Amino acid sequence: MQRAALTSALCYRDAKAALNFLEAAFGFELTMLIEDNDGKLAHAEMGFGDSLIMIGNEWSQMHKSPASIDGFNTQTVHIHLDADIDAHCERARAAGFEILMEPEDQFYGDRTYRCRDPEGHFWTVGAPIRSVSVDEAEATSGLKVVKGWA
């Protein structure tokens, strides 16, 4: 797999467990696994479509899983699908993700849901369901599109 110019990396208390629940919930595929001499995960990468995510353990006082810092997060990871979002949500729920927002149609034409993994990382998952013009999006949302509407 060719590397993207930008890749997210998440840390977990139990990164090996994270590999399993990310595969079960989202269908991510383990593409790289590096262990130290004691069999502890040193680095892992999981592929999804044309993207990848890096998974690792906590490695300093400033690099922690949300599970180690009272659930606080500074980022959300977004997954873009071309599949049945409702079925995907049920798969995530069955794998142990907490569903924070059930699948819902959005003003911009996607159907999305939000979830939290067992260590507290937030994920948003969306799939396009219809094309929406700028005028329609603005009228529906009350927001002003300034740049970049596709």
Predicted regions and their residues:
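C-terminal catalytic core of tyrosine-transesterase DNA break-rejoin enzymes
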Residues: 119
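A short, glycine-centered helix-capping/turn motif at helix boundaries
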Residues: 15
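Vicinal oxygen chelate
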Residues: 1-10, 19-20, 26-116, 126-150
